[in-house]
Amino acid sequence: DGTHNTRELGGYETTDGNKVKWGVLYRSDKLSDVSTDDQEYLSSLGIKNVIDFRSSNEKSEDPDLIPDGMRYIQLPIEADGAIRPKVEAMMRGQDQGDLGELLVEANAEFVSKYKGVYKDFLETLANEQKPSLFHCTAGKDRAGFAAAITLLAVGVPMETVINDYMKTNEYTKEFVDDYLKKIKLYSLNQADVDQLRPIMGVEERFIICLLYTSDAADDRYRG
């Protein structure tokens, strides 16, 4: 109930005919609003590690509510800082533009600036060998890239990886629609919510521009 983009990454077929094991890896948005029932459910899944990609400020504002017995691992990635002023201006109806293109530029830092963090993430998964959940705030950009390189590393085809990335739009549709209605209302109908929608979801161009670069797809990520 307290998350909008939580799902398992098991069951995908790999290029060598195997399948990604069920009950091992989960991706999510922030865990700051989970209920007691949610926490009990997470415990029932056998999750042992929670990996948080959020910045210090994000974690301070919305600390995770993690069940006892789970290890909390912090791998912070600053995200969207450069485009936040423009987003806020658009929410007030004071600016226009292609937020999707801005997000492409912001996400490019996952490769150019935070490659070491993602390498640490993959090494953590490999070394721990325990059921793990990883997340950022919305569970779509930082966590979405983490899911993509993990699936690629175990041999899941690129097309399947992209399809998993795009599932965020299905999982978050109701939440995003409601949120954008509120923005429209609070801005006295000045905000162009169609301009804002790209930053609330995902588009193929967001992930393709990362996965088809030599840096993102090379052996240093695949492990």
Where do the PLM segments sit?
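Cysteine-dependent PTP/DSP-like catalytic domain, specifically the C-terminal lobe
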Residues: 116-134, 144-211
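Catalytic-loop region of hydrolases
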Residues: 1-22, 33-49
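Conserved beta-strand segments of alpha/beta enzyme cores
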Residues: 24, 71-73, 160
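Substrate/cofactor-recognition hotspot
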Residues: 139
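Single conserved hydrophobic/aromatic residue that forms the stacking wall/gate
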Residues: 212-223
